[in-house]
Amino acid sequence: MSVVGFDVGNLSSYIAVARGGGIETMANEYSDRLTPSVVSFGEKSRTQGHAARSQAITNYKNTLSQFKRFIARQFSDPSVQKDAHVVPYKVTQLPNGNVGMQVQYLGETETFTPEQIYAMILTKLKATAEVNLCRKVVDCVISVPQYYTDLERRGVIHAAEIAGLNCLRVISDTTAVALAYGIYKQDLPTPEEKPRNVVFVDCGHSSLQVSVCAFNKGKLKVLANASDKNLGGRDFDWLLAEHFAVDFQTRYKMDVKSNQRAWLRLMAECDKTKKLMSANATVISMNIECIMNDRDVSGKISRADFEALAAELLKRVEVPLKSVLEQTKLKPEDIHSIEIVGGSSRIPSIKETIKKVFKKECSTTLNQDEAVARGCALQCAILSPTFRVRDFTVTDLTPYPIELEWKGTEGEDGSMEVSHKNHQAPFSKMLTFYRKEPFELVARYADTNLPLPERRIGRFKINGVFPTAEGESSKIKVKVRVDGHGIFKVSSASLIEKLPAQAEDAMEDSSPEENGPSKEEGSGASQSENDAPMDQSPVEGGAGEGEASADKEEQAENGAKETSKDKDQTSEGSKSDKESKDQNSEGSKSDNGSTETDAKATKKNKKTIKTHELTITASTDELSIAEVNNFFEKEGKMIAQDRLEKEKNDAKNAVEEYVYDMREKLCDKFEQYVSEKERGSFSKLLEETENWLYEDGEDETKSVYQAKITSLKKIGDPIENRYKEKHERPVAFEELGKALMLYGKTLDLYSQGDEKYSHIEKDEMAKVEKCLKEKEAWRDSKTSAQNQKAAYQDPVVTAQQIRSEIQSMKFICDPIINKPKPKPKEEPPKDNGPTPAEAAKDGGPAPTTEGEEKMDTGDQAPTGEASKEGETKPDETKPDVEMELD
């Protein structure tokens, strides 16, 4: 299972993967870890990444970039209208009111949705990851800006589906950065201690995002988010471009804004100038050749002038920085550090602004370009069952407050706030309604400062609602949830029906099929009925965990009630038992009869609860399943077209490469291996092929190019083989000579009676001698014949044939020469009488050796002088092994 994280930015994208115990950032076919977020369309194929960016000026009308800002947005959105005037391609309105991007593709006018273009970039990133991992990539985690709404997050998930990916989690950019920061920290405070507050600032190409996170060991909690979705590096580029446009108008009387290609070139140069100013405080020069009307332009700007121009933009940088402090009620001294990421965070004036607000130096311990992708890969590893990752809990938050609206039973409208701003996510809440018929819930954002003009999230219809047997409103429990993606949904709905005792007996007799899908609950309901239209019980865990915890609490509460009731009944029963001792048997029987009657009445009045699962019909403005499937099929066709075009271009390039390579070698390396006549005809054919490539053969099929190179190789391969054989044949003949010499020496030793070969029969050695004579004769004849051939003629013998002769000679000679000597015959052991074990078995005394006798003697008590001399004191007894300890 692959563990991959994708950071799809407004300007560029990165891929990170978890493997080898760490996180790696993948490089593409250009050995670059950065892949431009650009897709370009042509008459025959489309290109993504670096190849597409190279066409951003020459094919600007069909080159799409900055598509992230159009996902799930209406064409009438003011921000869409602003961006539509910035991008060089045509932005149109789709029938459903969303944004479409119009290009010329395969000779036809095509309109693509932003989700499709996003999927095309994911397809490119997926292919790059698969090349590096040598396996299929399916599961992934994708980053999105923290300010993305519900619809935009759904759009990213649909884009992943179109690209054939399973998005395990959509994670905010700053949350991914915080995860990449915190999971490796070993000095975080323990859960019981005060958390470490860290600010993360991500200044990218089109937006500024700020987040405050609290860290404890093994835990990350996002406290607050703030952003400016219209403030990024491109705004500083526009500022410079406007400055130089006015300058060129004044000095050169040239309006570069009137020419789209000239404006794009100026924007590219301004981006380079901005980067140079970030690293140098000196005056930076700009020179653009033939920008417009075959005229060159030049300009200069210093960092001080640039910062003066950007004063208004720098003031806007302070707004989200101060906002997170206000939301969290933190002071600058409560902040441990400020981590900055994003390409635009390298601008010195932005760093100074951050320092001024937080009164601390900015920290750059994270990779400013790759931190988001690395955090995505870590999140994917945490979610993957195939990876063991250090326990680390991530608690994100909802960027906007969410409210529910509904129509009451008597026509009045009702509403309530499901989650406030910065509510922790994911979360679930259980809501209770009382209805007689199906009803509809409308979810919308409560924040009026939403980046989208449309605040509605979706409509959710609760189906299958029916009244009680008495005609009253039924109790409906609805669970709403914001999941790990940050997407709101109504996850489940159920109708609680109370059944009397007789209904219970009938239900027990009926089959499950007759009752339908339902489940039984105990007598205690999770929530009591009241006059309020609804009540709620927040569940902070996951959906399953929330239900389980609620059920456990209900069971525990009900169990406690039943236990206390049983105790009361037991005490009453014991009292009645004591009283019954003083009564006669008839009185006891009457008491027992009345007790049984009361028990039957209690059983008759007992009610049970039956739960009916209800269906939910969701209606949102996201892509439908049919649209996603249709786009998936189109993406597959485009991938096949791209592959076919690539194979065709590779075949064409192979023909062109062969023509140039062979034409050069005919006059250099292969000159003496081809006759004058053959060289002339082959050179003419190569020239004709070159002309054909640029004329009639400029756009042919793959098979035509393959046939062309095959016909050329029929002439060129024999020439190349002559050159190859000229260099390999002497080496092969030398190997044959060494083998003949080795076997010849063996024959000499055998004839001299060498003991090493004395076991070999004469007939066998005669076979070796005969084989050597045949190979020597073959070598001499082939060498003589080859010497009579010219270099441009085909060889008499090849190096492969010579090596085959060597192998055949070894096959005959080696088994004979390497034949092992037979082992000498072993004499049977002499009979020296029975062994000690056999003697003991027969009952006789076992013979002992001299050593054994000495050991027996040593075990006996010493006598005489010998015993005195051999006697040792207990303190002087030596151990069996002496060890010297250093």
From Swiss-Prot:
Gene Ontology cellular-component terms listed: cytosol; nucleus
Subcellular compartments: Cytoplasm
One Pfam family it belongs to: HSP70
Region (Disordered): 501-614, 775-795, 813-886
SUPFAM superfamilies, sorted: Actin-like ATPase domain, Heat shock protein 70kD (HSP70), C-terminal subdomain, Heat shock protein 70kD (HSP70), peptide-binding domain
Compositionally skewed regions (Polar residues) per UniProt: 585-594
Basic and acidic residues bias: start-end ranges: 549-584, 866-886
Keywords attached to this entry: ATP-binding, Cytoplasm, Nucleotide-binding
Lineage top rank: taxon: Eukaryota
Keyword ATP-binding (UniProt): yes
Gene3D superfamilies associated with the record: 1.20.1270.10, 3.30.30.30, 3.30.420.40, Actin, Chain A, domain 4, Substrate Binding Domain Of DNAk, Chain A, domain 1
Listed name of the protein: 97 kDa heat shock protein
UniProt lineage: Eukaryota, Metazoa, Echinodermata, Eleutherozoa, Echinozoa
